[in-house]
Amino acid sequence: MLLMLTQWLQGLSPELSFLRVFQYLTLRAVMAALTALLIGLIAGPKVIRMLTSLKIGQPIRGYAMQTHLSKSGTPTMGGVLILGSIAISTLLWFDLSNRFVWIVLAVTLGFGAIGWVDDWRKVVNKDPEGMRSREKYFWQSVIGLLAALYLVFSISENSNTRVFELFITWVQSGFLMDLPPKAGLLVPFFKEVSYPLGVLGFVILTYLVIVGSSNAVNLTDGLDGLAIMPVIMVGASLGIFAYVTGNAGYAKYLLFPYIAGSGELLIFCAAMAGAGLAFLWFNTHPAQVFMGDVGALALGAALGTIAVIVRQEIVLAIMGGIFVVEALSVMLQVTWFKYTKRKYGEGRRLLKMAPLHHHFEKSGWKETQVVVRFWIITMLLCLVGLTTLKLR
């Protein structure tokens, strides 16, 4: 919005040519981060007071750890603060004609809406389970598939072909029609190695990355500050990849596919980092507010969508290794429990408690130890992911 305003003002008078500085993507990214940070810090106390007055407190499951019982009643749904800060800052500083930022915003707010309904049911109905899994997964799938279809259309080589005609062509090919090389699954650490994906493969991969990332971040959000800092670090790192893939010169030099327009995603990533830091100010132990599903589902979906656009799905799995391991710990725990119950008559557990962060708590780690150590691991994984920019 401000970019268009400065361009209009420059056209009015040559004396306003200094506003040309706002054409620089990096400057707008810094401003987006600062704007989101300030919005979050200023609005944070008011949002917390509002949530408290509405008695929107976090219900604690009956099987929760004893050390967590004191958190019952802590305001939740603080993710609205994060999403509001991101949305306002992004809309102010990005190029409104950029389709990639719009789709990321749409997916983020869509998954945020799912999380909002889930949190609201937990609070109003006093039901720690919230939305039933099938219902939640259904709506996640709807948004994930719509996003996947939009993205596969946006990267088609036949950009001048009408959408309906292109869709008919894909149907006739059984959705196996090849896509441009830049739409392939990029393999990190190898020079110009990518796995070609047809339309169907791209849609399935995109769907899995968005929905999987969303739920993985949600499962990680179980301790004060545990999820938000890794989201900040992974998001900032993806912003660097977006900047590279959106710059023809850098993309060519570093052997990345050039994706026109993806650089503007740096604005969103910067806003997400700023909003995340502001939220962490209130979410650090002992937390004054929790982000809830409205924040966790949305932020995870945002990371997944950005990774798909900049073709860094595997790198996302590396940098977000904590999210991956947390999700796998739950899947393995549930699978093993059901298998042993069917075979031996009683369920057995691989971990003392899932997700993994609770296992470490049960093993004697303090909450702050788990959180900070997971932060350190994420920082190292992000550095590994960033090395793929050059080590190819």
UniProtKB/Swiss-Prot annotation:
Membrane topology recorded in Swiss-Prot or TrEMBL: Multi-pass membrane protein
GO biological process, one term: cell wall organization
Subcellular compartments: Cell inner membrane
Keywords: Cell cycle, Cell division, Cell inner membrane, Cell membrane, Cell shape, Cell wall biogenesis/degradation, Magnesium, Membrane, Metal-binding, Peptidoglycan synthesis, Transferase, Transmembrane, Transmembrane helix
PROSITE patterns: MRAY_1, MRAY_2
Cofactor: Mg(2+)
Pfam short name (any one): MraY_sig1
Top-level enzyme category: transferase
Transmembrane segments: 24-44, 76-96, 100-120, 137-157, 167-187, 193-213, 225-245, 262-282, 289-309, 314-334, 369-389
HAMAP family: MraY (MF_00038)
Protein function: Catalyzes the initial step of the lipid cycle reactions in the biosynthesis of the cell wall peptidoglycan: transfers peptidoglycan precursor phospho-MurNAc-pentapeptide from UDP-MurNAc-pentapeptide onto the lipid carrier undecaprenyl phosphate, yielding undecaprenyl-pyrophosphoryl-MurNAc-pentapeptide, known as lipid I.
Name of this protein: Phospho-N-acetylmuramoyl-pentapeptide-transferase
Record lineage: Bacteria, Pseudomonadati, Pseudomonadota, Betaproteobacteria, Burkholderiales
Gene name of this polypeptide: mraY
